[in-house]
Amino acid sequence: MWRQMSPELRTAAAKAFWADEQAALEQAEAVALIARQIRFRPKSVMSLPVDKKAKHLGGIAQVSDLLAARMVIAYHLEHQRPMMGAFLDLLGIAHEDGLIKDEEPKKPEDATLDKAVKELSEKFPRQDVARYFWALLWQDPETWGGLKGRPELAID
């Protein structure tokens, strides 16, 4: 999914990622990746402003799956909370500003999921919905397995 995102969208995701205080491990991986890419020492990369680090990282299409997933999740938390909240509301899942309250949410019923997917796809841009569904599947394939194989996952 990361490679299919535009450089602008990847940069926005990377910027949100650098602000994520819980992504220290992935940020270290990103620093090493940028350092290799621009031939800087990691210490020099760490001292770059967030916008520069985000631009460098957003320009790299080939990153690890773990790093890509973390950036996509950070992007959603920063820029897509209304969509996240709308989907959870449609499913009747308790949340706080798009973040699920329950540590282990119950798998949605197929009929409820079908209806929620359809309604969300009508209210929000197709590409945004697809990226969100992929992020859910990556985070918790057991709970969100009902999203697999749906046409709404298609990213052009």
What are these model-predicted stretches?
Residues 1-23:
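Charged, amphipathic alpha-helical stretches
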Residues 12, 41-43, 150-152:
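Small/flexible residues
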Residues 19-146:
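Acidic, low-complexity, intrinsically disordered interaction modules
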